[in-house]
Amino acid sequence: VNGFALADKKTNVNLIRKDVGMVFQHFNLYNNKSVIENIMLAPRIVLKRPEEENRELAMKLLDKVGLANKAESMPAQLSGGQKQRIAIARSLAMKPKCLLFDEPTSALDPEMIDDVLDVMKDIAKNSNMTMLVVTHEMGFARAVADRVIFMADGRILEDDSTEKFFGDQPSTERAREFMSKISGH
């Protein structure tokens, strides 16, 4: 990450963590804190960002994810798609260089998925941030990714450009099976 080998025992992982954001499939918001407090918490504690600057950035991020009107709401008052967009805003508040997404749409109702994917597409298009996305949303991967890594049983089976992976037939039988099943729906 950012030129450092995480597997190298000499690498100080704690120095790298502040440059890497993570969006989990189950949001992990603090239920006892408002939306804006959830977004402002890590930058205040980790980065020691001043309150006014922190609040201003949090509101900009809420606007970016289409939820500025929910700043004072509690997580229990939000839909799953709204919670996931708040989780994305919370990660962006740390101004990471790399953002990791772990199946960000898997816990969502189908009608909420597009809202989250639209936010992610906007990040991919309008920022210079590296995004690593674990997803089964192949349409999203095809539209946004510049590289596709296909994994099965914990092993990398394919590592190609998006054009090659989706344009040509994948080189492994397992990837071809997967692609034929999802294209059949």
Give the location of each predicted region.
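C-terminal boundary and immediately downstream tail of ABC-type ATPase nucleotide-binding domains
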Residues: 163-185
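ABC family nucleotide-binding domain
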Residues: 1-145, 149-158, 162
